[in-house]
Each structure stands twice: as C-alpha cells, then as structure tokens.
C-alpha cells in the first residue's frame, strides 16, 4: 500500500493530526478518526458519523482505509481455537490465532509481524517459508481488528508470537503495541501485551533502553551455548551468553520478570543435564518465568515428548530453581495453530466458516 496516499489505520493520533492539517481539516478531527478506527472499530469511512459528510468524502478521496483480506478460517474441534489466514498482497499470506483459554475469561490473539521469517528455527514451520517482508503497522493491527470482528468478541491479551521475528520489525511492532495499549484506542494494559524474540539481543537492548512497558518473552529452547545453534540459527549471530546478559539487564533495569519459552524436544534439549543448565540460567537471571512447551511439529524428524518425559523434565527443573514454571498447553494443534505450527497446511474442519 503506497504511503503517497496515506493509510489511516496504523497511525498515531499525532500522525492523524498531520494528515488532517494537510487536508485542510481541523486538528481535533484526528481524535475522532483515531477513536473511530481503534475503539469503535469502524470498517469503512462512511461509518465515521461524528464527521460531516463533507469531511468523510475528503478522507475517501485523499486517504486509504484498507483491510487485510480474510482467507481460511479453521476452527479447532478440540478447544475452539481459530486460525485465520490473511492475504496482504499477491502470494503473501500471514496467520493469526484466536485462543479462548477459558482461564478467567482470558482471550488471546496471537499475531504475526512478518510475512515468513528472517530466521530458521528448526522446530518452527514459519522458517520453511520464503521471507517476503515486514508487515506495516496497520497490517499488524488489522489482524486484531479482523479477528475480533470475525469471532464477535474482544481480546484480553495480545501476543506477538505468530509468523516472523518481532525484533526484525521493531519500529512497526512497537508502534502497534503502543496503539494497542492506548486507552483511547484498544485500551489493553501494557502487561496484557507480550512481545517475543528468538534471541535478537540488539532488539532486546533497544527495548530496555526505551523502557518499554510490555511483557517480554525469549524463545530459549536450549541451555547449551554450542548446541543451541543446531536448534536456532539466531544463536550464531546472537550467542546464548550475550542473550543471558541481555536478560539480566532487562530484569535489573526494568525491574520486572522476563519469560523464557522452552520447546521440549526429546534427545535434543531435555533430560536431567539440560534441566539443570536451564535452572542455572534461571537462577542467574533471577526475575524470570519459564514456559515449557511440548514440541508440536513433526516435519523435523524429532518427536513430541511423552507426558512422562515432560513430568520428569519439569520435576528436575523445579528441584533446581524457584522460578515459576508453566507447562504451557498447545491449543489448536488439530488445525496447525499451536506454537511452531503456523504456515503448516491445515485440514479444514467441519466447522470451518
């Protein structure tokens, strides 16, 4: 979408003021447009009835109000999770997932930040795709707008854990996160928004320096500095030692816990030794939480751990650290909507819309 003709979605209030002034409109119109986009969730400019018809016509003539195009809508028979495929250009697809956990009414949308991914994490299907670029801020936010409209409900939490590496699209991701947080827009609390990374230390350090208020998660997945590269190629450029240093800096300077995500893979990163190494990292970082996730994908030749293997690993981990440990469930596995499965070809369920 060419910005020679400005796109209203994805803009901050200040940016909308600049657009209004450039069109000869009163500056206060920006606040009306802003709340109309993000709070009222209007799908067309004609719905902005707080604006005069003359103003609406001027906006339609000189600005754009696009939507990402809905493709597939798969519904899990197991837990009600829904995975949406959206088209953002010719041969460019992204996915977002609606996760109704049922835990105290928590409703999460997992959104994408890139078309494909710049990294190649061996357990993640997105890494198999050709990288086709960063998403613009409006395309990130429109995933939330579209999913909420399609499910007829509002999210309580947003996680940037879909397709792509958020730290490689830092500006657009953080801009979207701040709009999601704004009380005049989506109105989500900062700690209901989680930004994730596979371990891009430059992005983590920038996040710290900017004193960003959001939750932050690191996809760790191996506690051994040398072996981690065999699971995640990001470790070659951003070694585990520097990653842990950044995590320590995060907890010290921002004075809040960081989350480590750990995909459990038998014969790769499980067993007592790896549990003890992971616990040592947790102790050194001090303020952290650990989410352990059984491997979901099977294209790697690796297998999903058994329940007993998971229990054994978590038991050894708990014996060596006081950090909170969550055995994260994997909603949407039957529609390839769980962690690491985005971009895998799903089987349309009988409840597909």
Curated annotation (Swiss-Prot):
Record has Cell wall biogenesis/degradation as a keyword: no
Keyword Metal-binding: yes
Binding site for S-adenosyl-L-methionine: 164-165, 196, 219-221, 296
Membrane-traversing stretches: none
UniProt-annotated binding residues for [4Fe-4S] cluster: 117, 121, 124
Main subcellular location: cytoplasm
Record CDD domains: Radical_SAM
Gene3D superfamilies, per the entry: 1.10.150.530, Aldolase class I
UniProt keyword terms in alphabetical order: 4Fe-4S, Cytoplasm, Disulfide bond, Iron, Iron-sulfur, Metal-binding, Methyltransferase, rRNA processing, S-adenosyl-L-methionine, Transferase, tRNA processing
Chain ranges of the Radical SAM core domain: 103-333
GO cellular component term of the entry, any: cytoplasm
Intracellular or extracellular location(s): Cytoplasm
Recorded family membership: Belongs to the radical SAM superfamily. RlmN family.
Function, as annotated: Specifically methylates position 2 of adenine 2503 in 23S rRNA and position 2 of adenine 37 in tRNAs.
Name used for this protein in its record: Probable dual-specificity RNA methyltransferase RlmN
